[in-house]
Each structure stands twice: as C-alpha cells, then as structure tokens.
Regions:
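Noncatalytic alpha-helical scaffold of FAD-dependent oxidoreductases
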Residues: 1-299
C-alpha cells in the first residue's frame, strides 16, 4: 500500500511518529537538499545561565540552520543552565579544506564502569572539563559533520560509562514562548533530584510535525541521559508531570517509563491516532511493549 499527503492521508499522518504501529515501511521517497561542501562551519559560545542560553539559542536560530546546546544540568542557583551553545551551517567552498572529510576515531571506554563511579562528583568533574575544553577552542572552526551532529560518538563505547544497567534518555519539548520559565523549571526539578546526567542537550524546536503523534512543536527541546537506577521511574514520572503542566510533550521514540494516563493527558491528538489505527488495524495485530504499556494493547 502507498500512502502520502494525497493518498490515504490519514494513514500517512498516523505513520509519521506512529512508533511502528501502522505497519512496516518498506520504501520511502523524500526530497534531498544539495549542500555546498561536506564540512560544517561551527561556532561555540559559552553561556552563564539559562536565561542567557535561551536568548542565545533564539538569536542563533534566526541565522544558523543547526543549533544545539550542552548544559551542565547539575549547576544550580545563579548558574543554572550554564553551558556551551553550538551553531552550525554547511561550509561554502571557499571556507572548506580541500580533502573530503573523514571521521576520526577517538578514545575508547574499555570496560563498563562500576555503578558507584557515576555520581554527582564525577559528573561535576566531567562538566567542568567539557566546558573548559570548548571555552579554549575558540568561537569558529570547520569540522566534520559527524563531530558536530554526534559529538559523543567521538568517544567510542561511551555508553559503558553508565555501567551494566545502562541509561535511558528523557526528551521533551516545552512551549517556552507560551510558558516562560518552563525550561528553567524542568532543569531545576532534574538537578534537585540528582539525575546525575553527563549529557543534557537543549535545542530550538521548529514547526509542528505533520504526524498525529509527531514530536516536534515550536519550543525548546531538552534531552537528559539518565542512569538506570531504582529511582529512575519516579524521576521520569516527576519530569513528565511537569511537562504536562507546562503544555509540552515527551519524545515517544526515546520513552521507556511514561504511564498511560500521562500520555492521555499530554497528547490531545491521541484520540485521532487511535481512531485511524482502529480503521487500519482493528485487531491491534501490530503492537509493541510500549503500546502495551501506553495504549492498553494485549501483551
């Protein structure tokens, strides 16, 4: 079956962000955009707090196609939201080095760290080093796109830092314009509960997605890597409740802990998605562990 904006449009919209519940996608057609070179011009800027961070993020989004920020999620008080903002665009031919860029290998985490190694002290040390390194590198460089878009992959097997239990990622988007201070309140809640996250990534989120359960909407996206611990479920539930109050949404593709009642209160488009799903798959033959947890599908 083929679907698009013009053909079986309801199925098309349900499939975008539909978590695989509408069928197997065998072939996709999309339009690509030409780029001038395979290099990225990157600018970095150290920021002191969350207000300065959000202002710099909004200003960068007007002129730079790629913006992302790293935040020290353990900083509190006047330093809450301190971090590094990265701005990027494709380099023009005159700016780019002659050789085609190749990704460089980096150091490797050789083994899984013990659970006690990940604590507020070690995370604070990592954050201080990370902030210092980028502050010394200066404002503008030409870099490989892999280095810009996936900076953590410069350290191979970095997931071993979280030990055998691994980690989960909590990502949400908050309507900062309609709810000023929403990002500050989320970071305050995360820091106050000792999330001990090495990675807190903040992005400017663009237009509303077309899908019935698409994640994007105008606002600020916040992603936290959280070590899996006994208290992780409770921490995620607290953060999810805050997102609901602020009128935001959680990224379902990275969700492992959201409750069914939270999704129902968070997602006004859910009823339409369920209606379309019932039309095309009335027996709910396509289901997942997540749909069992969130949509009441049979296990």
């Amino acid at each position: 079956m083929r679907c698009s904006r013009d053909e079986h449009a309801d199925l098309f919209r349900a499939t975008l962000g539909g978590m695989g519940l509408t069928g197997h996608i065998l072939e996709v057609e999309f339009r690509v955009v030409p780029i001038p070179t395979p290099w990225i011009v990157q600018e970095t800027e150290s920021v002191r707090d969350i207000d300065e961070f959000l202002a710099a993020l909004a200003a960068a989004a007007r002129d730079w196609p790629f913006t992302v920020g790293w935040i020290d999620c353990l900083a509190r008080g006047a330093r809450l939201g301190r971090g590094v903002l990265f701005r990027g665009r494709w380099a023009e031919p005159a700016e780019a080095p002659a050789p085609v860029p190749r990704p460089r290998g980096g150091p490797t985490v050789p083994f899984e760290l013990p659970s006690w190694a990940l604590n507020d002290l070690s995370v604070r040390l990592f954050n201080a080093v990370y902030a210092g390194v980028h502050a010394r590198r200066g404002r503008r460089r030409v870099v490989h796109p892999q280095r810009f878009f996936w900076p953590l992959d410069g350290v191979r097997s970095w997931n071993r830092i979280y030990g055998r239990r691994g980690f989960t990622q909590f990502q949400c988007v908050l309507p900062e314009r309609e709810r000023p201070g929403a990002t500050r309140r989320l970071l305050t809640a995360a820091a106050g509960r000792g999330g001990a996250s090495f990675l807190c990534v903040v992005k400017d989120c663009g237009a509303e997605g077309e899908g019935l359960l698409s994640f994007p909407r105008p606002g600020v996206s916040v992603a936290l890597d959280l070590p899996r611990r006994a208290e992780t479920q409770q921490l995620v539930e607290v953060l999810a409740e805050l997102v609901i109050v602020e009128g935001g949404r959680v990224y379902l593709a990275k969700d492992s802990f959201l409750r069914a009642d939270q999704l129902a209160r968070m997602e006004p488009r859910l009823a339409e998605f369920l209606r379309v799903r019932a039309r095309w798959d009335p027996g709910r033959r396509l289901r997942s562990a997540q749909s069992v947890r969130l949509l009441g599908d049979p296990a």
